[in-house]
Amino acid sequence: MRKTVLAVALAVVVVLVAASMTYYVSRNSPLGSDNSECSDPGSISSHVYNPYRLTIIKSCIRASGVVENVFDEADGDYHVRLALDSQYSNLTNSANDQYQFGDLVVEVICALPITQADAVSACQNYTNNITIPSVNDRVIVTGPYVLDTQHSNWAEIHPVYTLTIS
């Protein structure tokens, strides 16, 4: 009887470990990239204004493409529209098609003077060191892949962890 209980307990532990590993990999493996390229340097995510509005799909992904447009936002972010390279075309959705000309939204946070009063506290004690791209720059970005629930659930990388102009 004691051996049976031990065997059952061991089996339960093995199943729980396997399930935990599967969950961890599914939540943390970026699309099109390995985890070595994707991390949150300096806890950038802790400086996102009203993070509750973002539904995290993947904790970190990599994507590349050409910058279509760059907008200043009142919350201090740069809103970058990225025309994705074909291998990343699955990252956009119908809301991106309808409101963002089919582009992925890429948000570089706390990079501008903040003119929206309730956003000021999010950027306190954080200095953004990410280079801001120009229109027509080819870039590679990493960061959380999210849906913005306050903007029709369009897809974004928000915040950008790294941005390389290539």
Residue ranges and their predicted role:
Residues 2-9, 16-166:
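OB-fold and OB-like single-stranded nucleic-acid-recognition modules
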